[in-house]
Curated annotation (Swiss-Prot):
UniProt feature, compositional bias: Basic and acidic residues: 122-134
Effect of residue 959 to A: Slightly decreases activation by PKA. Abolishes activation by PKA
Organism: Rattus norvegicus (Rat)
Protein name, UniProt field: Hormone-sensitive lipase
Upper classification of the organism: Eukaryota, Metazoa, Chordata, Craniata, Vertebrata
Gene name linked to the record: Lipe
Biased composition (Low complexity): 59-76
């Protein structure tokens, strides 16, 4: 016979006629060892010792089979009632509506053949046993259906209240589908049902249920922890938001400009398409629920309630794990929760003080945004993540599926982040005591500012680039940031060896796997890169988007436009009329600084082909970008637009071109319906200030004079730019006013840099954790633009090679690294899986011998991360760096910076600092005692340092990386108003047109926008400031990534449209 396919133990065959002998009953299988996959609690059911039998064969009649299963169901239900009654498990007394299928019963009867009498003996035994059980037990005369009793009681005892059983309709539909299959009616005969089976089941269930009842958490904790479940989360947040409404004066939530955003609804967080259906959830969806819940907490709970809840949970978890014995994991978990409690209690009053004075630094009551608010908001996000993780631990710590090591790593990472945020809060307090009311930037003399920065930049940063990467941003942006960080550290591993070229990108593909699976390694390597690699590395990394393959993919996903042409503006002087007297003219000279006269590149983008854009003169200026095949028919030219947008791209003055920003510029051209010309200015450090300003001003004046060639009449002109481009937009307008020529009708600057001084501000403190704008990177870009960045020796070697030499060299390096990189990638993973336990590292005190130099110069040099993977087995029996605490990552290298040849080789690859660097760059500590000494005195002439007033017993974590290449003193040129417009005199700022600023609440450059808007407002200049929430610096380049970035980009379009709209005529 063909055996029927297995079914769930909750399957039922039901009937609704009183005369029928078939009632609700389960079908059991005799193989107790078989794993059930249809029901989540089947594994626990096997642990109870319940035998799971298969259904009877169809050799008996339908009525006899029904009687047998009815008696078996009655016996099982009566037994479970007896067991569950003393344990106070609720037994449902109502049944769901049942349905009968007559055709199925007739089919089952017709299929029964000879041999029906084989079940008489078993049936008599069951009847005898049923009578015995019925006389021995007391219960209702008509017990409820056995399946409902068993399923409900076992689900409550084993699965908990959060696991739901299949509905009755689903069971009936499944029964119909299986009964309609003729092969499903053939089952093997159950023989030899033992009469003592009931007693075995009784003892097994009773022992397991009593043990489970003892392990149930207390009722008060069950009530408190219910809010972390998916079904009750929304109700909790809604109730908390109603009971604890946010105070308007508190400003704990930075208001954005996106009205469709509803933070309290954690199911509608952006980037995931709204609420997920109840039921099956993948790992990604669970991860999303974790992030969304923490984000919802940070927006729905006030600071005091959040801190008190976190402290209560930390104390409970600490007491629990302290009582779990001398295990290493339990001890570390207890210490982590003790640290969480200490840091939360110490941070809460400081944040409250910052919130109490934050409103004095806002632009106005309609725009409550500044660095102090952003710092408090970031700390609240960290507290919210710790609160959610603590609740998860408290509710799952008794489960056999609780991953102690994973949760320990998460908690240690966020505890390190909370410790550093507490240090930033004290730094912000220090700024409050030094600065005047309403001033966000450090106002002390330059020596005090350098001393303040010197203490700040020594803080540990790696914890913010591992597991905690981007915790302050919207959940939809975090996967991108993780991908970016993995690519960055992989790219940085091979940059110094390969210098430049395609080989760096190819080699990084083989090493990114380690950083993807080990967040601690990624954070440590990220910190090493941002502190030691020069501006040429960032220029090479940011220019990856300029690769033809990536730019082509981006263009395929962007809007299709009729015109996208690169123009080369000739370096020829021309005349421009003065605005005060059009009869008079002024000569606009071509750019001359540093490199002499040269053409200026600009890209013309237009959604429609307009008059003038296909003229012979413009075609003569077009620069070829490679062959293109145009298959579409030549469109009819549209009339000239009344407006024109002149765009200046960002990139820290050192990287990117208009090609990188082309995707969102095409969208602008479509939505605005105007031509856009984007200027490709020369980049630093090869062309420092004022070369970029001269080229942008020259291109702007050329566009105003030749607007007819660009498809516009030039009635309304808008200057638009982001980041460094926003700075250039403002300075170009200042230069146009100084020349007396036409200034634009308005400026739209997105997250601009308005001062390039090395001054501390509350928002710039956030650069400690920002993956896109670390403080050292900002300093290197400023140094490159101001002309103080020195050129490395390998740059001169590249110039000597020439273009063809670079191509030949990069090709050979690519082929070599393709082979060696694959070998290194395979070896690194083979070492992880096949490393011998007796392998020991070099002793910490052993120095390198001269014979070891050959190994240090091998072509495939091992990095810091590879050396970390080769660490010996520790107390926990692991050989991976991710099992170490963040504290170990912070201080392990202080005592012995060269613990292994690989470490020494890595530092040698980065390039040690020369003695001349010591006077201008920070030293790295060699011991913990030296670090403590630096907290009290300055290394410069022994002058007492200006440092944050840390309370007794609090010591932030210091970086263990090498020399930080960041100048302590700003070059005097950065005070030039054409470089730092925030420092411009009032008479210059009064010449600016209306300025519309769009900033990010979590951007280190937020205070630049706030202070510049305050200055313009105090002068009576028209200015607007819009602040968007939860987005990083550079959201325009991420416009296609998620809903928030698209809405923020649309806000910039609205500001431009406002500028291009002619003012209404006054009423007469």
């Amino acid at each position: 016979m063909k055996p029927r396919r297995p079914i769930s133990f909750t399957r039922e065959i039901t009937a609704m006629e009183p005369s029928s002998t078939s009632v609700s009953r389960p079908e059991w299988r005799p193989e107790a060892q078989q794993t059930l996959t249809d029901y989540p609690g089947s594994r626990e059911l096997q642990e109870f010792g319940i035998p799971q039998k298969q259904s009877l064969p169809n050799e008996a009649t339908a009525q006899q089979g029904a009687e047998f299963q009815q008696e078996q169901g009655v016996q099982q239900s009566t037994l479970l009632q007896k067991l569950l009654t003393p344990l106070a498990f609720p037994v449902p007394q109502q049944s769901f509506p049942s349905h009968k299928v007559h055709s199925d019963q007739q089919e089952a009867t017709s299929q029964n053949g000879p041999g029906a009498g084989k079940v008489h003996t078993t049936q008599k035994e069951l009847e005898h046993r049923d009578e015995h059980v019925g006389t021995a037990e007391s219960g209702p005369a008509e017990p409820p259906p056995a399946t409902e009793v068993e399923a409900t009681s076992i689900a409550q005892a084993v699965s908990g209240p959060d696991k739901k059983l299949p509905t009755q309709t689903d069971l009936v539909s499944q029964e119909r589908a299986e009964q309609s299959d003729p092969t499903a009616q053939q089952t093997p005969l159950v023989q030899g049902v033992k009469s003592d089976q009931g007693s075995l089941i009784e003892s097994g269930i009773l022992a397991r249920l009593q043990k489970l009842a003892i392990q149930q958490p207390s009722q008060e904790w069950k009530t408190f922890l219910d809010c972390v479940t998916e079904s009750d989360m929304e109700k909790y947040l809604n109730s908390s938001s109603k009971s604890n409404p946010p105070e308007p004066s508190g400003g704990t939530v930075i208001p954005g400009t996106l009205p469709s955003k509803q933070k309290p609804d954690c199911g509608k967080m952006s980037g995931y398409g709204g609420k997920l259906p109840h039921g099956k959830k993948g790992i990604l969806q669970k991860h999303k629920h974790y992030w969304d819940t923490a984000s919802a907490f940070s927006h729905s709970m006030d600071l005091r309630t959040m801190t008190q809840s976190l402290v209560a949970l930390a104390e409970d978890n600490m007491a629990f794990f302290s009582s779990q014995g001398p295990g290493e994991t339990a001890r570390r978990l207890s210490n982590v929760f003790a640290g969480v409690r200490e840091q939360a209690l110490g941070l809460e009053p400081t944040l409250g003080q910052l919130l109490g004075v934050a409103h004095h630094f806002d632009l106005d009551t309609e725009t409550p945004a500044n660095g102090y608010r952003s710092l408090v908001h970031t700390a609240r996000c960290c507290l919210a993540h710790l609160l959610h993780k603590s609740r998860y631990v408290a509710s799952n710590r008794r489960s056999i599926f609780f991953r102690a090591s994973h949760n320990l790593a998460e908690l240690e990472a966020y505890l390190a982040a909370l410790t550093q945020l507490r240090a930033l809060a004290y730094y912000a307090q220090r700024l409050l005591t030094i600065n005047r009311p309403g001033v966000l930037f450090f106002e002390g003399d330059e020596g005090l500012s350098a001393d303040f920065l010197q203490d700040y930049v020594t803080l540990h940063k790696g914890c913010f680039y591992g597991r905690c990467l981007g915790f302050q941003f919207t959940p939809a942006i975090r996967p991108f940031l993780q991908t970016l960080s993995i690519g960055l550290v992989s790219f940085g591993e091979h940059y110094k060896r390969n210098e430049t070229g395609l080989s760096v990108t190819a080699s990084s593909l083989f090493t990114g796997g380690r950083f993807a699976i080990d967040p601690e390694l990624r954070g440590a390597e990220f910190e090493r890169i941002i502190q030691n690699l020069d501006v040429h590395f960032w220029k090479a990394f940011w220019n990856i988007t300029e690769i033809e393959v990536l730019s082509s993919l981006a263009n395929m996903a962007s809007t299709t436009v009729r015109v996208s042409r690169l123009l080369s503006l000739p370096p020829e002087a021309f005349e421009m009329p003065l605005t005060s007297d059009p009869k008079l003219t002024v000569t606009i000279s071509p750019p001359l600084a540093h490199t002499g006269p040269g053409p200026v590149l600009a890209r013309l983008i237009s959604y429609d082909l307009r008059e003038g854009q296909d003229s012979k003169m413009l075609n003569s200026l077009a620069k070829s970008e490679g062959p293109r095949l145009e298959l579409r028919p030549r469109p009819q030219q549209a009339p000239r637009s009344r407006a024109l947008v002149v765009h200046i791209h960002g990139g820290g003055f050192v990287a990117q071109t208009s090609k990188s920003h082309e995707p969102y510029l095409k969208n602008w051209a479509q939505e605005l319906g105007v031509p856009i010309i984007s200027i490709d200015y020369s980049l630093a450090p090869e062309a420092p200030f004022p070369r970029a300003l001269e080229e942008c001003f020259f291109a702007y004046c050329w566009a105003v004079k030749h607007c007819e060639l660009l498809g516009s009449t030039g009635e309304r002109i808008c200057l638009a730019g982001d980041s460094a481009g926003g700075n250039l937009c403002i300075t170009v307008s200042l230069r146009a006013a100084a020349y007396g020529v036409r200034v634009p009708d308005g400026i739209m600057a997105a997250y601009p840099v308005t001062t390039l001084q090395s001054s501390a501000s509350p928002s710039r403190l956030l650069s400690l954790m920002d993956p896109l704008l670390p403080l050292s990177v900002l300093s290197k870009c400023v140094s490159a633009y101001s002309g103080t960045e020195t050129e490395d020796h390998f740059d001169s070697d590249q110039k000597a090679l020439g273009v063809m030499g670079l191509v030949q060299r990069d090709t050979s390096l690519f082929l070599r690294d393709l082979r060696l990189g694959a070998s290194s990638w395979l070896n690194s993973f083979l070492e992880l899986s096949g490393r011998k336990p007796h392998k020991t590292p070099l002793p910490a005190t052993e120095t390198l011998r001269p014979t070891d130099s050959g190994r240090l110069t091998e072509s495939m040099r091992r990095s810091v991360s590879e050396a970390a993977l080769a660490q010996p087995e520790g107390l926990l029996g692991t050989d991976s760096l991710k099992k170490l605490t963040i504290k170990d990552l912070s201080f392990k290298g202080n005592s012995e910076p060269s613990d292994s040849p690989e470490m020494s080789q890595s530092m040698e690859t980065l390039g040690p600092s020369t003695p001349s660097d010591v006077n201008f760059f920070l030293r790295s500590g060699n011991s913990q005692e030296e670090a403590e000494t630096r907290d009290d005195i300055s290394p410069m002439d022994g002058i007492p340092r200006v440092r944050a007033a840390f309370p007794d017993g609090f010591h932030p974590r210091r970086s263990s990386q090498g020399v930080l290449h960041m100048p302590l003193y700003s070059s005097p040129i950065v005070k030039n108003p054409f470089m730092s417009p925030l420092l411009a005199p009032d008479v210059m700022l009064k010449t600016l047109p209306p300025v519309h600023l769009v900033a990010c609440a979590l951007d280190p450059m937020l205070d630049d926008s706030v202070m510049f808007a305050r200055r313009l407002k105090d002068l009576g200049q028209p200015v607007t400031l819009k602040v968007v929430e939860d987005l990083p610096h550079g959201f325009l380049s991420l416009a296609a990534l998620c809903r928030e970035t698209r809405q923020a980009a649309e806000l910039c379009v609205q500001r431009i449209r406002l500028i291009l709209t002619p003012p209404a005529a006054p009423l007469t």
